[in-house]
Amino acid sequence: TKTVEGINVGKDMYELMKEIVLPKELSVGEGYGTVEWAIRSIFEGYTGWFRHNSTTELYSYSPKSIFPELNDLIDKEMALKMVKDLIEKNEYLKAIHISEIIISSDNNKEALKMYLKIHQILLKESQKNSNRWIVKWLEFEIEKTKNKLNEEADSTT
C-alpha cells in the first residue's frame, strides 16, 4: 500500500525504493529478492514501463548508447578524480555510472581498476544481507572486469 500511496502523490519509483522499509515484524530476509525490487515491480505493474522521464524511453534506444560520445567529450583525468572522490564518499552507484562512461569506448585501465574496486566493496557489503542475485551479479562483474584488466595487460606485453 505504501508504494501505491506514493504513486498517488506523484513520487517516482527511485524515491519510493529509498523511502519504503518493511516493519521488523514482517522482515524475513532478502536472500532471493529485495524490498526495493518488490517496490519497483509494484510501481511498474501499476504505472507501466513508461516512466515519463524522457522521449527516448518510447524508442529502442539504450541510454548507454551515448556513452562513447560522452567519453569523447570529457576530460579523463577529471572524470577519474570524480570517480575516486565518489568512492571515498561511499557514493558507489554514481561512481559506477561515471566509470561505465569512461570504460565505454577505450577500457581505460584506471577506470577499470576503480570499477573493480567498487564492485569488490559492494560485494563485501552485500554479504551482510546475502541476497543471492546481488552476490552472484557482483561476482560476475568482478570476474569480467578482472578478465578485461588481464586482457589489457596481455596486449601490452
Predicted regions and their residues:
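Accessory terminal helices/loops
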Residues: T1-T157
